Design a protein with these regions (language model features):
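C-terminal non-catalytic regions of proteins with extracellular/luminal or membrane-system context
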Residues: 1, 5-8, 14-23, 43-55, ...
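Structural preference for beta-strand elements that scaffold enzyme active sites
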Residues: 10-12, 32-33
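A short alpha/beta connector and helix-capping loop motif
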Residues: 24-37
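Long, well-ordered, tryptophan-enriched scaffold segments
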Residues: 30, 40, 46-78
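Helix-enriched interaction subdomains in cytosolic or periplasmic regions
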Residues: 58, 69-102
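Short, conserved alpha-helical segments within structured domains
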Residues: 63, 85, 115-117
Length: 532
């Protein structure tokens, strides 16, 4: 299988919960462990397949060996004397939350907050943060921090309830009054667990109405309103133009509260980048027309155009692009260099770029490298992320960041080859701070070892055949005679060109209907082109 033979995987293959429909076929395809097991149905399926000869003992033994190797490796690495340091574990959780939070918006320098400013924290998530997923991903944490406990002296108002969506007038009015009396209002908002969890899909990108209503009401009386988000994925923000700052925490783990305060007050400089695009509305998403499918069939009509590959290729207006993330400092990109301008099969090219911290505080920048392919037969995204590196810089400091590209960096999966393929041509190497903020671009010429095999049929169009040198040599003169004949029939020379353009879209087998070629002649031409 590609998993083991091509990619070199040596571990165990485990199914998703309840994903097996035919245990014997699964083993033959490389499955090892079925989850959940124990009902006996899988065992009976295996025994029946062995007896019927549709599953070999060799295939079954391979799955058993993979399981035993895994058990053996776990046993060898067990450490009975290991001590779980809960404090160290929590400190790590805080650090992860601090480094992954994304500053989406920060107008007028509202953030970081000045120490001692009169701030108010609003929203139930300030006291009870949504910090982890639901369902089987849920864990029992030893320690969870909330923002309030790490911001002593800061006023608080609940503002909304997470167990319902309707506005609570008393809670909202108290929050709005507190916001109007403060210098800065920080609203902790997002999605309750009931909005997104294991086992079901989200049907909306909207937050609960009571939260959206609260943000709008607070922003109307407090120009310095900051929104801190707790959510598992992208959301709509109908209020985004009314607030100067938005900090995306996502589901930030045990240290969510402490990390939020450190980021808000500048003890830590935000450095996270979006790993997804935030569309403006649900109807903008690539799967909108085909989700959730019909009956038992899901149609993946978007193909490879998922996420930023879709939004950037269609130049869609998005809320926040893939890779976006601000900082309390600024970064300058310069001196993009490629170690070679032409690369062939088996060769690599090193791409280097210099990044400088041009601001007044230390910060981290995630440098992103995108590759834009030449136009070819296959529809490909306008650009794809092929590398990224996070670099830490003091004020005024510069560092050189290096990436290595090879054939795989330029390739796409070609169904006809059952493998990845990079077509010859000029590729753009783009470096920047997001998929929409590309600072520098270089050119790389790629020379494939072999052209992509092309197979023409009677259903191929004249335009397609004309892209092949042998096809153009044979079909070209035929096209010219047909166009000239059409021009002679009308008596207008200009009709030659228009007739030629029209004919490019017809199929080869139409030439038989036009009495231009016989079926035998067409088959001979196809054989000659395909064997060239």
């Amino acid at each position: 299988s590609p998993l083991r033979k091509r990619w070199g995987y040596e571990g165990m293959v485990v199914t998703d919960w309840g994903a097996v429909k035919d245990r014997a076929k699964g083993i033959a395809a490389g499955q090892d462990l079925e989850m959940p097991g124990g009902s006996g149905r899988g065992t009976n399926s295996i025994l029946s397949a062995i007896k019927a000869g549709t599953l070999s003992e060799e295939e079954l033994n391979a799955a058993v060996r993979n399981l035993l190797r895994f058990v053996d490796s776990v046993t060898k690495t067990e450490n009975a004397s290991a001590v779980f340091d809960r404090d160290a574990d929590y400190r790590m959780a805080v650090s992860v939350a601090e480094n992954s939070a994304v500053l989406l918006k920060n107008e007028k320098g509202v953030l970081p907050l000045a120490k001692g400013c009169k701030a108010v924290f609003l929203g139930e998530f300030a006291q009870h943060p949504r910090y982890q997923g639901g369902g089987s991903s849920h864990v029992n944490s030893a320690k969870v921090s909330c923002a309030l406990e790490h911001a002593p002296g800061v006023a608080y108002a609940q503002g909304y309830r997470t167990d319902e969506d309707t506005v609570d007038p008393a809670l909202e009015q108290a929050a709005v009054a507190a916001a109007a009396d403060a210098e800065v209002a920080v609203i902790f908002a997002g999605l309750p667990e009931r909005y997104e969890s294991e086992g079901y899909d989200r049907t909306t990108l909207a937050m609960p109405e009571n939260q959206n209503h609260l943000i709008a009401a607070v922003a109307a009386v407090q120009p310095n309103t900051v929104v801190v988000l707790h959510n598992g994925s992208a959301i709509e923000m109908p209020w985004v133009n009314d607030v100067p700052a938005v900090l995306e925490l996502y589901l930030a783990g045990d240290g969510a509260g402490e990390a939020a305060v450190n980021l808000l007050y500048g003890a830590v400089n935000p450095s996270g980048k979006l790993a997804e695009t935030f569309p403006r509305r649900l109807s903008d998403t690539p799967a909108y027309l085909s989700f959730p499918g019909e009956r038992e069939t899901s149609v993946y009509s978007e193909g490879v155009f998922v996420g930023y590959r879709y939004y950037d290729t269609t130049e869609a207006d998005v809320l926040f692009p893939f890779g976006h993330g601000l900082s309390y400092t600024t970064f300058e990109y310069s001196v993009l260099r490629l170690s070679r301008s032409t690369v062939r099969e088996g060769e690599e090219v090193q791409v280097t770029v210099t990044v400088k911290n041009t601001g007044a505080v230390a910060g981290k920048e995630t440098v992103q490298l995108y590759v834009a392919p030449p136009k070819g037969e296959r529809h490909r995204p306008v650009r794809e992320l092929k590398g990224f590196a996070k670099v830490s810089l003091q004020p005024g400091e510069s560092k050189e960041v290096q990436f290595t590209l090879d054939k795989r960096s330029l390739a796409y999966y070609e169904p006809e080859l059952h493998d990845f393929y990079a077509e010859s041509g000029t590729y753009q190497i783009c470096v920047g701070a997001s998929s929409r903020d590309l600072r520098l671009t270089g050119l790389l010429e790629w020379q494939a070892a072999q052209p992509l095999p092309v197979h023409f049929t009677a259903a191929s169009t004249l335009k397609q055949v004309m892209t092949h040198p042998v096809g153009a040599a044979i079909i070209g003169p035929i096209l010219q005679r047909m166009a000239a004949a059409a021009g002679s029939a009308t008596g207008k020379k200009d009709d030659d060109d228009s007739s030629l353009s029209m004919m490019m879209g017809i199929q080869l087998n139409t030439l038989i209907d036009f009495h231009v070629l016989t079926e035998e002649q067409l088959n001979g031409i196809l054989s000659q082109i395909n064997q060239a």
